[in-house]
């Protein structure tokens, strides 16, 4: 059976050196923030010190990490809710903090689906240690809560060594 090419955002696999990928840190999410899906790349909002989804393909600001999930007090029920998705503004009781959990280890390694394929082994090997843009980073599946971010393989280049493909 062939592998399905499903978009799933960035999934942590391990850190450099093979250590456990399970560590996250807590950051606040602004109550008016857009939806953030599990596996979405996030960055620090410049004005409020909260996290937000990485806003656009090709955004040159440094990523903070990858969104793992959140907790907030539901605006309708008043109950604490744990979710792999921040559904967006209007969802939380603004009297309480909205907490987002982010895989933010700079040595973290991820697996991500690509929007295309390399035609042969030599082409794939040539892309190792290059960088590429992430597309669809702001969208996700509202049923599963999983990001639809994927690697734009056509943008692979070796001018920025900060996030190499391995």
Regions found by a protein language model. Give the residues of each.
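Surface-exposed, low-hydrophobicity beta-strand/loop segments enriched in small/polar/acidic residues
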Residues: 1-166
């Amino acid at each position: 059976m062939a592998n399905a090419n499903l978009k799933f955002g960035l999934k942590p696999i391990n850190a450099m050196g093979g250590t456990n990928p399970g560590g996250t840190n807590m950051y606040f999410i602004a109550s008016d923030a857009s939806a953030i899906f599990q596996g979405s790349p996030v960055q620090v909002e410049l004005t409020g010190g909260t996290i937000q989804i990485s806003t656009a393909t090709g955004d040159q600001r440094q990523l903070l990490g990858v969104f793992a999930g959140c907790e907030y007090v539901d605006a309708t029920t008043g109950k604490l809710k744990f979710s792999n998705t921040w559904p967006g503004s209007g969802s939380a009781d603004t009297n309480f903090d909205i907490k987002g959990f982010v895989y933010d280890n700079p040595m973290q390694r991820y697996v991500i689906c690509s929007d295309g394929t390399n035609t042969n082994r030599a082409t794939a090997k040539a892309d190792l240690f290059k960088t590429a843009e992430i597309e669809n980073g702001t969208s996700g599946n509202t049923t599963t809560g999983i990001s639809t971010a994927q690697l734009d393989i056509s943008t692979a280049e070796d001018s920025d060594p900060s996030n190499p493909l391995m």
